[in-house]
């Protein structure tokens, strides 16, 4: 649980929406009031493959890889609600990526909420 208490660099493995093959990437998560949130830098011109994979299949593996190493089964919920996206963007801009453009993040950053399926950690 302590490893999930604050944001870290992690890996996630998704299932390729076209190939069905596992796809592992490195990414950062944030713990925002007990919610595990993954977001990326805003890009209006590009949809991330990992996000498209999670839209097709919300199951993923959340890989802790710092002091604690664990492969945690999880599910993702893509965050689409504008108010919810703005709250997350404001938190990230104030606490993690200082000064990031809140408007750009709200409009163009990928955002998902992760639910860990391991009952000990959930």
Task: Label each residue range with its predicted role.
Residues 1-8, 101:
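Extreme N-terminal tail/first-helix region
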């Amino acid at each position: 649980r302590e490893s999930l208490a604050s944001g870290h660099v992690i890996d996630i493995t998704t299932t390729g929406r076209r190939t069905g093959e596992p796809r592992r990437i490195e990414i950062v998560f944030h713990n925002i009031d007990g919610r595990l949130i993954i977001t990326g830098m805003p890009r209006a011109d590009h949809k991330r493959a990992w996000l498209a994979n999670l839209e097709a299949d919300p199951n993923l593996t959340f890989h802790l890889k710092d002091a604690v190493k664990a492969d945690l089964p999880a599910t993702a919920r893509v965050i689409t609600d504008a108010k919810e996206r703005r709250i997350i963007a404001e938190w990230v801009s104030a606490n993690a990526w200082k000064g990031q453009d809140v408007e750009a993040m709200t409009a163009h950053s990928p955002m998902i909420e992760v639910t860990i399926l391991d009952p000990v950690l959930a």
